[in-house]
Regions:
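Acidic, small/polar-enriched beta strand-loop surface segments
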Residues: 7, 104, 116-221, 225-270, ...
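A generic structural motif
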Residues: 1, 38-45, 126-128, 228-231, ...
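A generic structural signal for short beta-strands and their flanking turns/coil linkers
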Residues: 11-13, 225-227, 275
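Charged- and aromatic-enriched interaction segments used to assemble
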Residues: 36-151
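Assembly/oligomerization scaffold segments
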Residues: 1-50, 142-157
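Glycine- and charge-enriched low-complexity intrinsically disordered segments
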Residues: 60, 276-286
Length: 286
């Protein structure tokens, strides 16, 4: 932007962005850069920026949403919808960690013990935590769909080389009995196809070993599928964590299903609005 006598702001000033009356972004100025030509470049972040704060925290018997609510109260952050994550974390020590990492650890524990994924984001000045099933863009019969007409180019990769496991083994050293408990879940069909790809870890006191190996196998016993889309027609509802329908012919395979948005970059230029998306998941048919 160009400097003038109307704009008066500094670090910490609130920034609101709307497009055609639609709320897009609410945050605060963190950095400004000025050139000799009086051009000003401004960097603003939403409330998620404050989750970079570091601390040491001990908590007991809280779900991830309860822990997030506690942190938000301690740091003066506004919250919106915080859906019940269900899984109770018996005891945890977070030492010299960012609030981001603490929350991610709580959500990871929920995911690996239940198979349920939750998404944290800032919705125009309010921290929301929602189940993945609540993150579809649009509504039934009118979901946002990306196809060959709405994106310029794509790059697709499928793999069993990263975060794919067809056998899960967890152990727990039971001090009361003096025995090591071993829990295993596996998919013999995929072991025959890919060989043994084993995930191993130890259990903490209070964790349900059988439930956790079953949840982990369900989570990891599949190919990873990643898709990058460039210059997609912009939609302000799309953010990291959204679920969008993708309908693309990849040559020998056709994709038509929901995919998870891992990262999203919106570009606004005059009357144009584009997105670059990184997606994962989805089922391939045909």
């Amino acid at each position: 932007m160009l400097r003038d006598d109307v704009l008066d702001f500094s670090e910490g000033s609130a920034v609101r962005m709307k497009e055609n009356g639609e709320e897009v972004f609410f945050g605060f100025v963190f950095k400004q850069q000025r050139s000799k030509e009086q051009l000003i470049s401004v960097t603003a972040y939403d409330q998620l920026r404050y989750l970079k704060n570091k601390d040491t925290i001990v908590y007991e018997n809280k779900t991830a949403d309860q822990f997030l609510r506690m942190l938000a109260a301690d740091y003066g952050l506004n919250t919106g919808v915080l859906e019940n994550t269900g899984y109770i974390i018996e005891s945890r020590v977070e030492e010299n960690s960012s609030l981001f990492d603490m929350i991610q650890n709580a959500l990871d524990l929920t995911l690996t013990n239940t198979g349920e994924m939750f998404v944290l984001y800032d919705d125009f000045g309010r921290l929301d935590l929602r189940h993945l099933s609540s993150m579809a863009v649009g509504r039934q019969g009118a979901y946002l769909m990306v196809d060959e007409e709405t994106c310029e180019t794509f790059d697709y990769v499928s793999s069993i080389d990263d975060n794919t496991f067809n056998k899960v083994k967890l152990t727990y050293d039971n001090e009361e009995t003096g025995f090591r408990e071993v829990y295993i879940a596996q998919d013999s069909g995929n072991i025959n196809r890919w060989g043994i790809l084993q995930y191993f870890d130890t259990l903490k006191k209070g964790e349900n070993g059988q439930a956790k190996v079953d949840a982990l196998l369900k989570l990891y016993n599949k190919k990873t599928r990643n898709l990058k889309l460039t210059n997609v027609l912009g939609d302000n509802r799309v953010r990291a964590g959204s679920m969008i329908v993708v309908n693309l012919d990849l040559g020998d395979m056709k994709l038509k299903n929901f995919m998870l948005v891992e990262s999203c970059r919106h570009t606004y230029k005059e009357s144009m609005h584009w997105m670059d998306l990184t997606l994962r998941g989805g089922e391939f048919v045909g």
